[in-house]
Amino acid sequence: LEIASAWFSTFLTTKPIEETVEEFIKHRDFLHGMGAKVIVVSEQGHSIQGLMDVPLFKNKPVFTEEEWEKLADGLHHLGKLAQEKGLHIVYHHHMGTGVQTTTEIEKLMDMTDPALVSLLFDTGHLVFSGEEPLYILKKYLPRIKHVHLKDIRQEVVDVVKEKELSFLQAVKNGAFTVPGDGVIVFDEVFTILANSNYQGWFVVEAEQDPALANPFEYALKARKFIQEKAGL
């Protein structure tokens, strides 16, 4: 049994960096002790992903230039701390945060050192946001050190936009599902990664109501799909 990683929330845009650093070191040391190779980080300053009644698309946060600078500088510092223990930070672009869209991902990648800040590639969050995942995958392939395989139920996403629902409401309504159960075509994703030097994890994610989608059945469905499509 091996650990893939564990989420870490940064607040580099809204709080003193010392607060994030103090918590990050504890998290880093735990993951190092567990044998992980990467640390998933996501900036939660101004994030609305955990707010039940705030419309996801209407109220998405947008960073100021000063906040972008704080984020980039802070991530460089965390990247160095991670490397002290032989780990890498992988940045998780995420719905309801200041790094969600293609433009925002590109800005973050442009502002950060590839040697210190890697990227987590999440199919579900990119498609949910309306982005083209293959564009991000191809452009930043050398910087991608962690992959989340997540599918989308487009009909639920359409309702989220129409009714101005929050991220949590979207999840509860089934916006996400396992690979092969939604609208995302994974064939080229697997092909590109197979033909690259990618050595990281494929993490299957599908946050949804277990009363509606039996976790064991959906885990088997995802496993079968990946085996058939990727040969893994």
Where are the model-predicted features located?
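Active-site acidic/histidine proton-transfer and metal-coordination neighborhood
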Residues: 16-119
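N-terminal entry module detector
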Residues: 1-26, 232
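Short amphipathic alpha-helical segments at helix-loop
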Residues: 12, 59-63, 90, 171-174, ...
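Active-site beta-loop-alpha junctions enriched in small/polar residues
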Residues: 8-13, 44-46, 94-96, 122-126, ...
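Histidine-acidic metal/acid-base catalytic patches
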Residues: 80, 102-118, 127-232
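A short alpha-helix capping/helix-coil boundary motif
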Residues: 5-8, 56-59, 86, 167-171
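Hydrophobic faces of well-ordered beta-strands that scaffold small-molecule active sites
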Residues: 3-8, 39-41, 89-91, 117-121, ...
